[in-house]
Regions:
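N-terminal Sec-pathway targeting helices
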Residues: 1-17
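Compositionally biased, low-complexity segments enriched in small residues
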Residues: 2, 47-50, 103
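Flexible "cap/lid" subdomain of the alpha/beta-hydrolase fold that forms the substrate-access gate
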Residues: 18-73, 92, 108, 115-149, ...
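Conserved HGGG/HGGXW glycine-rich cap/lid loop of the alpha/beta-hydrolase fold
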Residues: 73-117
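Conserved active-site region of classical short-chain dehydrogenase/reductase
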Residues: 95, 131, 321
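Catalytic histidine-centered segment of alpha/beta-hydrolase-like enzymes
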Residues: 311-320, 324
Length: 335
């Protein structure tokens, strides 16, 4: 028995040394090498990146010390539609949708806090805080009431935004996110449903994975699209996600201390808001199969449900025309 305990102690000691070497030696070296690699990548792709940028009205502003980057399309005097992107995305996730949405509206697609060219200095990623800061951006632009269209993790913040500040919302289109909060869902159940949430509870693991944005974006997109992931789209997304600091702050969204699942999911289903809500969902998303929306008609009586066909998680890339058509019908009906 003593021999076994000594052996076990040696094994555990070696494992601890290997883990320490990985965390304190290998990971920092890898991070430096990747930073240099992606700095070169951005330099090599600067021209094509800038060419895409010229196709949209790019803007930067500072609100309460936070820098925000956003693009605009449509009528600058029209009713506003705010577009919120998910992970690992940016304003660019709406590139193919924006030109197809009614151009009589003022369309604003932002780089959400921590992403792309928006702020990465603030450390508070509580969902309510980020939602409030996003509203502050709109207020600074002279916008009081607006529609919200959100996708993936943008829907987390979008849902909190419309729940906390319904007086500013004209209508809400939420895409690619759970709608019905599972009964008696504790954190363990939530993690089983969404294992990536558990994985990214470790900021080290989240930053480690996102720190290689080319690999991370390839892994996420290619498995969750029904159409080919083309190279220009991939390169633009990698360029923006590889900006220094992004991989360090984006995992903050996943930390449990920042969560409020009821505001992000439950309240949307059960609340009769003074504005219409549309759940727009891809019909071929393995992470969110149709079965989890089977009870929407009975449990979420104030929410409209619509499917995007032949699309997966990134339906804004797979089927931008369907997405835009659904948005147009929704905003026209909400007038």
């Amino acid at each position: 028995m003593k021999r076994f305990l000594k052996f076990l102690a040696v094994v555990l000691g070696c494992a601890a040394l290997l883990l320490a070497a990985f965390v304190w030696i290998y990971a920092p070296i890898r991070a430096r090498n990747l930073a240099a690699q992606y700095e070169q990548f951005r330099a090599e792709h600067q021209a094509e990146h800038d060419t895409i940028d010229t196709q949209f009205n790019q803007h930067d502003t500072v609100v309460n010390g936070l820098k925000w980057h956003y693009v605009e399309a449509g009528n600058p005097n029209g009713t506003v539609i705010l577009f919120l992107h998910g992970l690992p995305e940016g304003w660019y996730s709406w590139r193919y949708v924006l030109p197809l949405v009614d151009q009589n509206y003022r369309l604003i697609a932002i780089d959400m806090k921590g992403y792309g060219r928006s702020d990465r200095t603030d450390t508070d990623y509580n969902w309510h805080t980020v939602a409030s800061q996003t509203l502050d951006l709109m207020t600074s632009l002279g916008i009081d009431k607006f529609y919200v269209v959100s996708h993936d993790w943008g829907t987390i913040i979008g849902s909190v935004l419309v729940s906390d500040h319904p007086e500013h919302i004209l209508g809400y289109v939420r895409m690619e996110a759970d709608l019905i909060q599972r009964k008696n869902t504790g954190m363990i159940s939530a993690y089983i449903q969404k294992p990536q949430w558990l994985l990214f509870q470790s900021k080290f693991i989240g930053s480690y994975m996102m720190g290689d944005p080319g690999w991370f974006i390839n892994m996420v997109y290619t498995k969750r699209m029904t159409t080919p992931f083309n190279q220009p789209d991939r390169d633009y997304l990698v360029y923006e996600f590889s900006r220094p600091g992004v991989s360090e702050v984006v995992p903050e969204y996943f930390l449990q201390k920042n969560w409020d699942l009821n505001a992000a999911i439950g309240k949307i289903c059960t609340t009769n808001f003074p504005f219409p809500v549309l759940q727009l969902q891809a019909d071929s998303d393995p992470a969110q199969p149709k079965s989890i929306f089977a009870d929407v008609a009975t449990e979420c009586r104030h929410v409209q449900m619509q499917w995007i066909t032949n699309a997966s998680q990134f339906d804004n890339f797979d089927q931008p025309q369907q997405v835009a058509d659904a948005i147009n019908r929704f905003i026209h009906a909400a007038k």
